[in-house]
């Protein structure tokens, strides 16, 4: 796998969960706790959380491809990826223009696409060694930094993969991923805005549905 393909995989794949249920009226909030300043203990907790989830996903992906494995993967991704937050940030101002029914449809499609692409990406990088290289505070919580290097192509430079996380209840959720300093959320936002401007809301939904039923990895 080339470096460009790997980066593309991370950008088109990585993020976010907790099956959404939209109530009547305003769209449901994600349950995010106001963070304020994040303590050293909380930072360490976030780092340990993503390390554990990451290792569990890799362990599941090393098992034979069965319906049980697919179920385990879906459950694991739902434990650390915040689909609600990702969807809101990716749609930006468009979020407030859409009905609960439209948002429910959108988030369901986004979740399915992310799950599929995350699995493909992780499977293709099982031979990469991941190192965790520190943290930094951000407004929403903490960014946990890592790098991935191929164990078979050691001359290939490592890829940096950073996880933006925030506390939700008593746990942590990932709401953005930076691959070589490129934001997944910003990448989605740019793509979604372009499609909506050119083809309208239904055009975006149609493209997402088509993508789910095809091998094409780009919107």
Regions found by a protein language model. Give the residues of each.
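Short beta-strand edge/turn micro-motifs at domain boundaries
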Residues: 158-186
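Surface-exposed, charged secondary-structure patches
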Residues: 116-159, 211-219
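Bacterial N-terminal signal peptides
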Residues: 8-19
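Early exported N-terminus immediately downstream of N-terminal targeting peptides
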Residues: 31-118
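Positively charged n-region of N-terminal signal peptides that target proteins for export
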Residues: 1-5
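Low-complexity, intrinsically disordered terminal/linker segments enriched in charged
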Residues: 176-219
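Compositionally biased, proline/threonine/alanine/serine-rich low-complexity intrinsically disordered stretches
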Residues: 24-44, 154-156, 206, 213-219
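Solvent-exposed loop/turn segments at secondary-structure junctions
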Residues: 95, 112-113, 137, 150-152, ...
């Amino acid at each position: 796998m080339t470096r460009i393909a790997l980066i593309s995989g991370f950008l088109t794949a990585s993020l976010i969960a907790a099956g959404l249920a939209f109530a009547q009226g305003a769209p449901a909030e994600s349950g995010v706790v106001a963070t304020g300043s994040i303590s050293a203990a909380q930072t360490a907790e976030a780092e340990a959380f993503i390390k554990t989830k990451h290792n569990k996903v890799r362990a599941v992906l090393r098992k034979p491809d069965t319906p049980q494995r697919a179920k385990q993967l879906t459950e694991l991704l739902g434990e650390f990826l915040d689909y609600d937050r990702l969807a809101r940030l990716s749609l930006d101002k468009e979020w407030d223009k859409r009905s609960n029914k439209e948002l429910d449809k959108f988030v369901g499609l986004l979740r399915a696409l992310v799950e599929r692409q995350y699995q493909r990406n992780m499977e293709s990088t099982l031979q990469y060694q991941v190192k965790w290289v520190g943290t930094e505070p951000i407004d929403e919580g903490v960014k946990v930094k890592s790098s991935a290097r191929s164990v078979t192509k050691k001359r290939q430079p490592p890829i940096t993969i950073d996880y933006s996380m925030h506390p939700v209840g008593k746990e942590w959720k990932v709401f953005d991923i930076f691959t070589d300093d490129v934001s997944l959320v910003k990448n989605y936002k740019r793509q979604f805005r372009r499609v909506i401007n050119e083809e309208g809301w239904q055009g975006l939904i149609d493209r997402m549905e088509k993508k789910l039923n095809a091998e094409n990895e780009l919107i």
